[in-house]
Amino acid sequence: IFQMNLDCACSGMDQRKVHMLAREAAPKLGLPPPVCLHNPLLPSLQITEANGSFDDNTNINASIKHKMSKSVGKGALWINDTSQEIREKYRQAYCPQKVVTGNPVMDHAHMLVFPHYHQLDIQRSSKYGGNITYHSFEELAKAYGKGDLHPLDLKNGVSAAVTKLIQPVSDYFENKPENLQAMRRLQVTR
């Protein structure tokens, strides 16, 4: 923060402790304390857990432990993933039936889909109840918790919505393949 001469640091909640340390140290270094903005962390689509304790707040600690990480390829979504890659990652995602809390697919619906679209469309065969639209996360959570929505239907619906959400980025990379290659060089996995 100080080396880059930043007035404001933006990051995930996992950087909160170091940012608070920077705010405490700034006056001692004769610098203004930076403004720090922290975003919630998207959970990994796979069951992963980092070792250690990261925050005194148990909810923040849990979100850091289960965060999406570029080092776990199948658990992380990349902005340059193809629609097929996104669909496959969601298809393989941890998504326990009737479990709302601690379910990464439900978390993605809550954090990605509803803020942008204010609804989640589920396309399914009439054999399985036909198409359905959930107009709020609360409505989705209630239905999923009761078992009215199958995990595969949830995965397919969230996958379609996330694919639509990043379509402008997909279009950009399709028109600028050299930038797509540069982005892929930055992707480091285990």
Residue spans of the language-model regions?
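Conserved nucleotide- and phosphate/pyrophosphate-binding catalytic cores
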Residues: 16-190
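Conserved alpha/beta enzyme-core scaffolds, especially Rossmann-like or related mixed alpha/beta domains
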Residues: 1-15
